[in-house]
């Protein structure tokens, strides 16, 4: 029987996001700087933990402090920006749940190479039923480039390594990747649209990923909102 995946916690909106299975693989999130990519992933993974009980590991260069990260996720779980009116007793079970379901990947003294990230994530995987590894953003990863190994080749090797590890262990690896410098559209004072081929460094982002989506902030006079565009879905009905 075909596995149509599970609800990521957005209710009816899930149909417009995606239905991941427990197969694992590679998901890429892209978007302009300050477009809300980290905020969306925090919200998504918060819902995944709360609604499905899945375990998430973060390698977050954006929010490296786990306590600050938990404080933000508590706000998301409560739907309140200000939690000052909640007592410690009220907050304790939420903090305890998050503390047990989310892990911050601590690289300590080692550089953030694909090998080191996977080695540390393997330690987490052996102690918890890990389902998601978040790398936010790719910009801070170190991939080896030299005269014999171009950036395109290095990115392809990194993506293949992450995807293979994810599929072997049924873990979704989500990598946040910025677009290259976008060109202005002819005759318009607007930048070209982001798609899966505008991700910086290599077309292999588009070629190898199982899912790709972009996040953008839309500002209008009648209100602001966040927009998600699903750019690639592999083998899903």
Which residues does each PLM region occupy?
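Conserved catalytic network of the ASCE P-loop NTPase/AAA+ motor domain
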Residues: 19-21, 50-52, 95-98, 123-127, ...
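Phosphate-binding/switch region of NTP-binding enzymes
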Residues: 15, 34, 158-237
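Amphipathic alpha-helical transducer elements in NTP-driven molecular machines
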Residues: 10, 66, 88-95, 111-114, ...
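Hydrophobic/aromatic beta-strand patches that form the interior of the parallel beta-sheet core
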Residues: 27-29, 57-59, 105, 174, ...
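The Walker A/P-loop phosphate-binding site
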Residues: 1-79
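Active-site lining segments that contact anionic ligands and/or coordinate catalytic metals
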Residues: 23-26, 53-56, 130, 135-138, ...
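Conserved inter-motif catalytic segment of the P-loop NTP-binding fold
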Residues: 52-149, 157
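Feature representing long, continuous alpha-helical segments
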Residues: 27, 39-43, 71, 115, ...
């Amino acid at each position: 029987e075909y596995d149509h995946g599970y609800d990521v916690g957005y209710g009816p909106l899930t149909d417009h996001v995606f239905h991941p299975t427990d197969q694992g693989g590679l998901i890429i999130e892209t978007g302009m700087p300050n477009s809300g990519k980290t905020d969306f992933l925090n919200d998504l993974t918060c819902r995944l933990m709360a609604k499905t009980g899945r375990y998430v590991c973060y390698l977050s260069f954006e929010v490296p402090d786990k306590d600050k990260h938990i404080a933000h996720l508590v706000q998301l779980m409560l739907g309140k920006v200000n939690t000052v009116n909640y007592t410690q007793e009220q907050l304790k079970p939420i903090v305890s749940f998050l503390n047990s379901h989310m892990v911050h990947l601590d690289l300590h003294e080692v550089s953030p190479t694909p090998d080191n990230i996977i080695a540390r994530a393997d330690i987490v995987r052996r102690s918890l039923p890990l389902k998601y590894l978040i790398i936010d953003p790719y910009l801070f990863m170190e991939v080896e480039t030299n005269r014999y190994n171009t950036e395109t080749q290095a990115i392809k090797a990194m993506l293949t390594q992450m995807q293979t590890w994810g599929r072997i262990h049924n873990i979704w690896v989500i990598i946040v990747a910025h677009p290259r410098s976008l060109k202005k559209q002819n005759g318009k004072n607007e930048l070209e649209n982001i798609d899966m081929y505008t991700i910086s460094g290599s077309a292999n982002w588009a070629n190898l990923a199982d899912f790709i989506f972009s996040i953008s902030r839309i500002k209008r006079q009648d209100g602001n909102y966040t927009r998600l565009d699903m750019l690639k879905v592999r083998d899903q009905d």
